[in-house]
């Protein structure tokens, strides 16, 4: 058993079964043994994100952020808050490109990289040391209490927020708890731990079939509510894999969407090696829109990562893909990396981009150009 498994087993022995949300929270965020408390190299061995593919991802995002700044009237300080910033790769790509290609925007830019792990905050600070010294970058454990004007964004963060597991059993919605028996973690079915789960599904008008499983992302709802309150004027941009509720809870997802990732392999062995594998569940974008509206946010639009990146790159024929002095071979390699980001069989159609706003008016964003 892993060290975290020992701790969780002892907790269950003493106090009884725990919700899967509690189990997932400990597996991912325990300050010592949690998966995301480890170095970024452990994470990279299990999966990679769009940031890892090519710097053009950050460069095109920088262009979108710069346009947002323009729409806000070019405020003297534009607070760009990245939630779940990790070791700061994306921050470095956005900052470096803004400094070299978007100088007016860069002068107004205050980039805050929010990350729970102290080791990763230190890595992020080191990676953007020049921008720290120039007063354009800071790493923080918490989201700023106020964001007067700016954008708060995340890339593959919400899929890793803890979820409650549920199952329709004998015509009633039950919760799947985590128990420990016969020296292993097992499912334990019981009544819902909180009425908020019932409200979550009722809000979407979901009708489950017998034995259908689903995840309730209550923490994602709390997250969008809180960041919506802290944002005074600007945008919230969410990039993640998931669906709107009608698709997320249909009969194509009878077993839910929860997966464990280890060594680039996806499995449903959630209880294997607690703290040493990633756990994710698809994002419910309808919930983000619904709870966001309650916090004063308005949906600007939602599109695929493919459409988003292509719309942003169309203006200069994706010239941001290449570095000065690149050889033909290096340029060809960069084009192949771009395909991973935008082609349907790569990341392009699996990932969705949701943009919400508060107090910005109705100006069109380039990344959402062409959507209905």
Language model segments and positions:
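Conserved acidic residues
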Residues: 149-150, 234
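Short, glycine/acidic-enriched loop or turn micro-motifs at the edges of active sites
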Residues: 118, 158, 243
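Conserved protein kinase catalytic core
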Residues: 88, 121, 161-162, 246
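A residue-level signal for conserved active-site and pocket-lining positions in enzyme catalytic cores
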Residues: 27, 152, 288
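A mobile, often basic/glycine-rich helix-loop segment
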Residues: 151-199, 252-261
């Amino acid at each position: 058993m892993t060290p975290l498994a020992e701790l969780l087993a002892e907790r269950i022995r003493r106090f009884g079964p725990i919700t899967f949300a509690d189990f997932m929270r400990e597996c991912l965020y325990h300050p010592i043994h949690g998966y995301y408390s480890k170095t970024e190299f452990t994470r990279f061995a299990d999966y990679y994100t769009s940031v890892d593919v090519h710097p053009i991802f950050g460069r095109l995002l920088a262009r979108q952020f710069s346009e947002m700044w323009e729409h806000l009237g070019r405020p003297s300080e534009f607070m760009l808050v990245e939630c779940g910033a990790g070791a700061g790769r994306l921050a470095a790509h956005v900052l470096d490109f803004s400094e070299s290609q978007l100088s007016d925007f860069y002068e107004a830019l205050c980039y805050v990289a929010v990350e729970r792990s102290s080791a990763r905050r230190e890595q992020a600070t080191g990676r953007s040391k020049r921008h720290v010294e120039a007063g354009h970058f800071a790493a923080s454990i918490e989201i700023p209490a106020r964001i007067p004007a700016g954008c708060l964004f995340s890339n593959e963060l919400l899929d890793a927020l803890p979820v409650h597991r549920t199952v329709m059993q004998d015509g009633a919605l039950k919760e799947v708890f985590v128990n420990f028996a016969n020296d292993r973690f097992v499912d334990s079915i019981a009544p819902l731990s909180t009425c908020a789960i019932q409200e979550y599904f009722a809000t979407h008008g979901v009708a489950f079939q017998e034995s259908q499983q689903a995840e309730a992302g209550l923490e994602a709802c709390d997250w969008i509510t809180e960041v919506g309150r802290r944002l005074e004027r600007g945008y919230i941009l969410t990039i993640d894999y998931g669906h709107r509720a009608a698709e997320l809870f249909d009969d194509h997802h009878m077993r839910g969407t929860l997966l464990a990732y280890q060594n680039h392999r996806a499995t449903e062995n959630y209880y294997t090696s607690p703290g040493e594998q990633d756990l994710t569940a698809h994002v419910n974008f309808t919930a983000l829109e619904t709870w966001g509206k309650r916090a004063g946010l308005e949906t600007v639009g939602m599109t695929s990562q493919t459409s988003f990146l292509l719309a942003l790159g169309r203006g200069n024929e994706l010239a941001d893909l290449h570095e000065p002095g690149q050889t033909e071979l290096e340029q060809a390699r960069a084009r192949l990396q771009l395909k991973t980001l935008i082609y349907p069989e790569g990341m392009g159609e699996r990932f969705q981009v949701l943009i919400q706003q508060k107090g910005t008016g109705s100006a069109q964003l380039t990344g959402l150009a062409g959507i209905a």
